[in-house]
From Swiss-Prot:
Organ and tissue specificity: Expressed in the outer layer of xylem and the vascular cambial zone of roots, in shoot cambium, but not in leaves.
GO biological process terms on file: systemic acquired resistance
Keyword Zinc (UniProt): no
SMART domains, A to Z: DPBB_1
Domain of life: Eukaryota
Lineage: Eukaryota, Viridiplantae, Streptophyta, Embryophyta, Tracheophyta
Protein's UniProt keywords contain Transcription: no
Gene that this sequence comes from: CjBAp12
Extent of the signal sequence: 1-24
Descriptive protein name: EG45-like domain containing protein
Amino acid sequence: MGVGTKVLVITTMAICLISSAAYASEGTATFYTPPYVPSACNGYKNDGVMIAAASYAIWNNGAVCNKSFRVKCTGATNQGTPHPCRGGSVLVKIVDLCPAGCQATIDLSQEAFSQIANPDAGKIKIEFNQA
C-alpha cells in the first residue's frame, strides 16, 4: 500500500469518526436498580450490569434489543444535583423496555448511571449513539 493510499485511508477513517460523533442524539437518562432479570429482550439471561432499558422513542418494536449504545452525560435537568456529570461516557447494551410512564429516553442500570453521573441527580441530559 502506497503512502498516498495510507493517507487516504487514515483521513477517511478520521472523517467517519468525527461525523459519527456529530450525529449523537440528545435525550435524558434515569436509572433502575436490581434485579435486572427478567428482561424484555433476553428473559432470564444474566446480561451483567452495564445494561439499559429503551424508551418507546427508540425501542422500535424491539429492534434495539442487544444493541450497544454509548451514553454521555451532558448536564442537569431541573431535578436533583445542579452539576451531576462525572465526565466520560459509558457503553451499555439495551436489554429491556422502559415501562409505561418512563421518564427518560434511556433508563440505565444503576451501575452504568453511576459511572457518568451522580445518582443523586436522578435524571440527567445525555447524548447517545449506537456503538
